[in-house]
């Protein structure tokens, strides 16, 4: 085994920078005073003796005043003497505040006053009003007094003492003639909203309006947010109306900021509502300003994942002569991508190309990601190459998507070459680029290349982050390189990056995926601090590896709830295997015991699993458990139970369940009705479906067509076809197969071609079988060859039809050739083609060949039919002349 160059990485020094230490003074209480230097110097040197100084108000003030050039020292001194029995006077605090304000240390002032306010009057020995009075007596600077008022408003707001904060705000205005800073106002309002006091905001704001105090766009956004939360539409309309008729210093800037604030706070509807009168009243006159406002609204709607509404706004833009720019299209495309509506994103992009709109690198990266999300990695890379040949400036994000696509395609070498091309163009790679390439290398088992890239990145001075280490460690584990993965974890710690539970999980799941179950268990046991996430990862890893016994055993040992995704993964895996369905039910019982409510879909999955193995009793038992727990089964659960009863030819039970679901207000859908009609074509469900507003689909029509074909009522069949066309429901290949099976003489190929419906193996089988039944073997073989030429792979059924036809017509040699051809094509013959061939051999006197075929069936574990055994038996008797 190759020794990978981890030691080469470990000697590369980490780029952990030492942050600058903040200035801090230690003032020991037992030091003796040095009389030859000043108080402030003694405090700095740590030689100041607090006991030697009479800590009266004058002495403290004298020391503090000597520290006016050093606010940090003043704060440290005050904090130190606060530990004495006698609290510092209000003048001492006022002096420190004046010093801190004088140096413009607003954050220090905020923290200092927050702690002071939190103590309360008893803890301080004075009231806040006393403090403000003391500051006012010392200082006449309006700026300083406003700063103190601002900090006090924020302190009270932080402590949710809103009445006191409002009181300070208005006291400052009435006594100083100026209100505290606008940021303090906005902070106070935002704290009120966060604390659920939106009602308080409205009254406070109207008083500010009455006094004519300044409010910026952000203030209005917050007030709108409060009204929105209160669902006070009347007040909201009143506010917006007043806003539209009010005069502002710079209306364009104000309204653009206001619209942006509304959009950022997920109130885009209000922003759009406001934009329209602004546009119509020519307040936003310039088209560029209108374009910016529309762009903000579109991006806001996309952020709220309301992409269709965003597209409607784009149409409104175009209607008013505003051309959507690249940023608008970028938001729409990215919104569709995030919403997983990939075809729509690509469609918007194609429309951009047709309109010859400018494309930027953001749109390129979004579109490339769309193709990757669809799994079309080859198309993504081809498109990247097309963009590369244009004059669009591609950035490292676009290249990164291309690296990822090539990695998924197994073309790691090509990805690295592309990486070299990117750096050659002067585009500096970031850690994400290296992470993608390293992940691609590990995915393809090229771990040495992953190490080389890691070393190269270190050489560029870029510090590896936790993500890249996780990818590397997980990749090594997945490739079975357990020791190298463990060494990577050690290297992380040596370089100051602490592995998290995510790191450990990637190693655990990687080792399990590589089949190293013992090493995964050992690694888990070696963890000093095991987290619940690690336990969850063990369960998920065993599920992914198909080790369901290990997964369930570990799960059942845990006495605490796991993330729902883990339950779902294990549950789904258990339901998929018939021998583990009972354990899936045990899992649900365990969830209920731990107080975890299962997803409703899990109930349907379990019932579906029991129904799949035809154990309706178990399915019904669990169904009854849901009823006793007052859990109403969902539509899927009811439908699958009804389908199972229908499949087992128990229509009464199926219909009883159907009536039960309606009683419980579970509305049947077209699938439910289709299942019932498929079981009992005599049911008349048309009126009921109309009452429930259930629109028929192609499956429903196919079932109905099949029903009337059996009744030989072609008039109703054609009426159904006509109704399908009226509803614009295109018949599928199953519909045509049903029609062909009942009326094989009808030529449907032209109509299918018109609807672009391509025949499948079942359709071809019906055609072949019909030609065989009328004795036209040549036409049957021609259709068979046509099926293969069209790219449809035959299964056993068309082969069997041809074999039976050949045997019936006495062409035994040709029948055997078709049988051998079937085996050569990879189709395993079942009992039906064997039975046809045996019957042909017996009918034509080839008894030994028939006996040989029976033995061959038994060797392959295929049980011969009674008819085959009887045919061989009578053929033997006939051959012996005993009949």
Swiss-Prot record:
Keywords, comma-separated and alphabetical: Repeat
One Pfam family in the UniProt entry: PPR
Superkingdom of origin: Eukaryota
PPR repeats: 145-180, 181-215, 216-251, 253-285, 290-324, 325-359, 360-394, 395-429, 430-464, 465-499, 500-534, 537-561, 563-598, 599-633, 634-668, 697-731, 760-794, 795-829, 830-864
An annotated GO BP: embryo development ending in seed dormancy
Family from the record: Belongs to the PPR family. P subfamily.
PANTHER family hit by this protein: PENTATRICOPEPTIDE REPEAT-CONTAINING PROTEIN 4, MITOCHONDRIAL-RELATED (PTHR47938:SF35), RESPIRATORY COMPLEX I CHAPERONE (CIA84), PUTATIVE (AFU_ORTHOLOGUE AFUA_2G06020)-RELATED (PTHR47938)
Descriptive protein name: Putative pentatricopeptide repeat-containing protein At1g13800
Gene source species: Arabidopsis thaliana
Lineage of source species: Eukaryota, Viridiplantae, Streptophyta, Embryophyta, Tracheophyta
């Amino acid at each position: 085994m190759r020794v990978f160059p981890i030691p080469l990485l470990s000697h590369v020094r980490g780029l952990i920078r030492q942050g600058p230490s903040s200035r801090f003074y230690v003032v020991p209480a037992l030091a003796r005073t040095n009389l030859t230097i000043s108080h402030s110097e003694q405090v700095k040197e740590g030689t100041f003796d607090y006991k030697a100084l009479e800590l009266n108000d004058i002495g403290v003030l004298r020391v503090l005043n000597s520290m006016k050039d050093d606010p940090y020292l003043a704060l440290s001194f005050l904090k130190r003497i606060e530990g004495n029995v006698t609290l510092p006077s209000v003048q001492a605090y006022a002096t420190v505040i004046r010093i801190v304000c004088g140096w413009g240390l607003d954050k220090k002032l905020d923290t200092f006053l927050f702690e002071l306010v939190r103590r309360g009057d008893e803890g301080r020995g004075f009231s806040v009003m006393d403090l403000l009075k003391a500051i006012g007596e010392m200082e006449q600077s309006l700026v300083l007094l406003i700063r103190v008022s601002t900090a006090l408003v924020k302190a009270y707001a932080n402590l949710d003492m809103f009445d006191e904060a409002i009181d300070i705000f208005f006291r400052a205005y009435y006594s100083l003639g100026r209100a505290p800073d606008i940021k303090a106002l906005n902070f106070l309002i935002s704290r009120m909203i966060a604390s659920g006091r939106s009602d308080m905001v409205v009254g406070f704001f109207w008083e500010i309006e009455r006094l004519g105090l300044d409010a910026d766009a952000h203030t209005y956004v917050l007030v709108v947010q409060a009204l929105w939360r209160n669902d006070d539409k009347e007040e909201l309309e009143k506010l917006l109306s007043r806003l539209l008729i009010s005069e502002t210093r710079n209306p364009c800037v104000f309204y653009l900021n206001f619209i942006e604030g509304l959009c950022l706070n997920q109130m885009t509807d209000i922003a759009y509502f406001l934009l329209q009168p602004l546009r119509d009243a020519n307040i936003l006159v310039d088209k560029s300003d209108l374009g910016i406002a529309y762009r903000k609204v579109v991006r806001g709607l996309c952020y709220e994942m309301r992409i269709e509404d965003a597209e409607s706004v784009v149409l409104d833009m175009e209607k008013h002569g505003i051309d959507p720019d690249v940023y608008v299209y970028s938001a729409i495309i990215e919104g569709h991508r995030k919403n997983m509506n990939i075809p729509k994103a690509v469609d918007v992009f194609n429309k951009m190309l047709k309109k010859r709109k400018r494309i930027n690198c953001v749109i390129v990266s979004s579109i490339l990601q769309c193709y990757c999300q669809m799994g079309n990695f080859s198309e993504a890379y081809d498109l990247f190459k097309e963009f590369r040949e244009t004059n669009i400036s591609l950035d490292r994000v676009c290249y990164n998507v291309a690296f990822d696509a090539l990695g998924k395609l197994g073309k790691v070498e090509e990805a690295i070459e592309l990486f070299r091309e990117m750096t050659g163009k002067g585009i500096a790679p970031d850690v994400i680029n290296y992470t993608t390439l390293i992940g691609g290398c590990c995915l393809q088992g090229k771990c040495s290349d992953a190490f080389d890239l890691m070393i190269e990145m270190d050489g560029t001075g870029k510090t590896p982050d936790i993500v890249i280490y996780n990818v590397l460690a997980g990749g090594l584990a997945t490739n079975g390189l357990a020791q190298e993965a463990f060494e990577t974890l050690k290297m992380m710690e040596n370089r100051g990056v602490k592995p998290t539970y995510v790191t450990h999980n990637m190693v655990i799941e990687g080792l399990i995926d590589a089949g190293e179950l013992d090493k995964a268990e050992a690694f888990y046991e070696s963890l000093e601090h095991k987290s619940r996430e690690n336990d969850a990862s063990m369960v998920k890893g065993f599920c992914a590896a198909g080790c369901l016994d290990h997964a369930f055993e570990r799960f059942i040992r845990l006495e605490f709830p796991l993330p729902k995704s883990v339950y779902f993964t294990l549950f789904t895996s258990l339901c998929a295997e018939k021998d583990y369905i009972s354990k899936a039910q045990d899992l649900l019982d365990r969830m209920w015991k731990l107080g975890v409510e299962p997803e409703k879909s899990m109930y349907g999955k379990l019932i579906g699993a029991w129904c799949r193995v035809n154990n309706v009793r178990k399915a019904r038992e669990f169904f009854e458990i849901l009823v006793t727990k007052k859990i109403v089964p969902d539509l899927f659960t009811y439908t699958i139970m009804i389908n199972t009863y229908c499949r087992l030819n128990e229509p009464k039970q199926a219909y009883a369940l159907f009536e039960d679901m309606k009683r419980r207000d579970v509305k049947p859908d077209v699938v439910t009705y289709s299942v019932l009609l498929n079981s009992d074509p005599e049911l008349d469900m048309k009126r009921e479906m109309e009452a429930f507003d259930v629109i028929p689909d192609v499956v429903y029509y196919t079932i109905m067509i099949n029903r009337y074909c059996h009744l030989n009522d072609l008039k109703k069949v054609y009426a159904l076809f006509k109704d399908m066309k009226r509803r614009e429901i295109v018949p599928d290949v199953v519909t045509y197969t049903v029609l062909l099976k009942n009326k094989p003489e009808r030529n449907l190929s032209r109509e299918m071609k018109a609807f672009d419906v391509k025949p499948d193996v079942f359709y071809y089988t019906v055609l072949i079988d019909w030609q065989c039944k009328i004795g036209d073997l040549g036409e049957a073989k021609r259709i068979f060859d046509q099926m293969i030429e069209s790219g449809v792979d035959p299964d056993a059924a068309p082969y069997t039809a041809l074999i039976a036809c050949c045997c019936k017509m006495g062409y035994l040699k040709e029948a055997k050739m078709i049988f051998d051809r079937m085996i050569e094509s990879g189709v395993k013959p079942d009992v039906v083609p064997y039975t046809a061939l045996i019957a042909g051999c017996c009918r034509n006197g080839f008894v030994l060949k028939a006996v040989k075929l029976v033995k061959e069936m038994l060797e392959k574990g295929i049980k011969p039919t009674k008819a085959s055994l009887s045919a061989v038996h009578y053929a033997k008797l006939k051959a012996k002349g005993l009949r």
